[in-house]
Curated annotation (Swiss-Prot):
Family: Belongs to the homogentisate dioxygenase family.
Protein name: Homogentisate 1,2-dioxygenase
Domain of life: Bacteria
Keywords recorded for this protein, A-Z: Dioxygenase, Iron, Metal-binding, Oxidoreductase, Phenylalanine catabolism, Tyrosine catabolism
GO CC term, one of those recorded: cytoplasm
Positions contributing to Fe cation binding: H341, E347, H377
Source taxonomy: Bacteria, Pseudomonadati, Pseudomonadota, Betaproteobacteria, Burkholderiales
Chain residues that bind homogentisate: Y356, H377
GO molecular function: homogentisate 1,2-dioxygenase activity; iron ion binding
NCBIfam families noted in UniProt: hmgA
Amino acid sequence: MTLDLSTPATAGYLSGFANEFATEALPGALPHGRNSPQRAPYGLYAEQLSGTAFTAPRGHNRRSWLYRIRPAAVHRPFEPVTGPQRLVSEFGDSADVPPTPPNQLRWDPLPMPVEPTDFVEGLVTMAGNGSAAAMNGCAIHLYAANRSMQDRFFYSADGELLIVPQQGRLFIATEFGRLDVEPFEIAVIPRGVRFSVALPDGDARGYICENFGALLRLPDLGPIGSNGLANPRDFLTPQAAYEDREGAFELVAKLNGRLWRADIGHSPFDVVAWHGNYAPYKYDLRLFNTIGSISFDHPDPSIFLVLQSQSDTPGVDAIDFVIFPPRWLAAEDTFRPPWFHRNVASEFMGLVHGAYDAKAEGFVPGGASLHNCMSGHGPDADTFEKASASDTTKPHKVDATMAFMFETRTLIRPTRYALDTAQLQADYFECWQGIRKHFNPEQQ
């Protein structure tokens, strides 16, 4: 039996966020009433995968039990992957990253590769903060690929991967089952989970936030109430599916920002059954229940929060994943686009589709921008003039768009690649230079 990545998945999904799931690809493969029986059904091995400390509070504890044909330890020793290293996971003062400028930064999309390039080969780190070794902060990567991973499997020991496809579907085989992900959806692959990516559409491009710290969770809703934003039922986790395949395969690991490879004689997608709450999942951003003002003013962008990684300071997240989806704007006598802003947090933005309502041009799908701590940003000159003269007595729908933001509590440090690449727009600052002076002390 194999996990055929050439066609869409058929096993289906389990609904809910971080639920206590139980699923089996063969009847009776899950042990009854215990996790580690003396002899597991079908001659399987029982293996626990822990995503948090054993002693984490029950409400935060994440782990799963896997019942597999061979344990994960069965592979040859790892050795470093040779060739250029485009991944970075250390962003402290001693890290090999250049000084972070206070300038607003913006990039054109990552070009598609000319040579055959799979998902792992197409990764490049644009920015980040903290340290993978210290398990805090994040790295922000882009990917551009044009071929499926062939007899090759990958996992990151550095953090969980929040994948935001911009172009091309991803058929992702994991130890837990299949995830089929398309643009407008996201996928989260937990730290340590082995996976492989097939590209059914050929070219694929997108964004990744690799979270080194506390696991992503749904935010509390406060006075919004018991429903709204990203609803738990819309998160989908794969049902168990396995393959029993032997051959000359390669296992690639990411540890402390470095890639390592090992020979492995079988597919690691040999989990016949599993139960627990530590597993991959996907979410359709088009299902986000957008909240907004129906009187006046533009609320803070925290109303667009999908997922958060909490810090040790209450109310201050290490990472926020925020989206700006299609929505109605109805506020009267209000400047409706996102306002001019300086932020104690740092903001890395991407665009999946369409246009962003604060930028008339220059910010295109697949591109990115970075506005670091206290760097002034906001609508460009054309957007400001149009929005200042628009009729706000009528509602307006912002359509054909899907922008997002990775917002962090600490400085986002661009890598040497990000500052040297030809995709960096040297003239980004010009979009604000045409903003005119309107001040007249004689006219209120």
